[in-house]
Amino acid sequence: MPIVTEKTYLMMEKENKLAFLVDRGATKGDIKSAVEALFGVKVVKVNVMNTAEGKKAYVKLSPEYRATDIASKLGLI
């Protein structure tokens, strides 16, 4: 599930990153594979953070893809 906050919106624009709330059992490799398969993009890096709400994944896309384009396809912006 995508996360949209002021912080994640700025990350989309400046750092070419998307944020997702993922299953607690998901690994970085699982997240990378899922994002690449679902959106047809190349993922450079995945950072995860465990929070009380669940596990957040910050996914950095390859420069040839734009995070804002993916977000607009999802109807987030």
Please tell me what each predicted stretch does.
Residues 1-77:
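Contiguous, often N-terminal, cationic amphipathic patches that form binding interfaces
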